[in-house]
């Protein structure tokens, strides 16, 4: 039987304002989350520390310097693989993605 262990991957660069809202919604879906801090400023970094600590499903990875969204996603995928997740869905930190569609994406990934 194939194991399906999805994770949400959120690259973050100085966009901490809606992270708690994203984590609340993804938590209601029982979806683990990897936040990748892509060299954010101190204010954002502190906010991410608090957010990750207050959401049990969230893990925080911090990159030493900004490498861009692609580098943050790749770093997050390596972390996801090391944590034995089988699938990742990337979600933008600014809240622009429709989180109502996440379950549809996960259902499609699980059945294909």
Please describe what each predicted stretch is.
Residues 85-96:
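Short beta-strand-to-loop acidic/aromatic patch adjacent to the donor-nucleotide binding site
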Residues 5-7, 32:
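Cell-envelope/extracellular polymer assembly enzymes that use nucleotide-activated donors
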Residues 103-112:
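Conserved donor NDP-sugar-binding/catalytic core segment of glycosyltransferases
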Residues 46-83:
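Conserved donor nucleotide-binding strand/loop of the catalytic core
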Residues 14-28:
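Short, well-formed alpha-helical segments that are part of the catalytic scaffolds
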Residues 37-48, 95:
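A conserved acidic beta->alpha catalytic loop
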Residues 31-40, 61-63, 91:
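Short beta-strand/loop segment that forms part of the nucleotide-sugar
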Residues 69, 95-101:
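Hydrophobic/aromatic residue at the end of a short beta strand that borders the catalytic acidic motif
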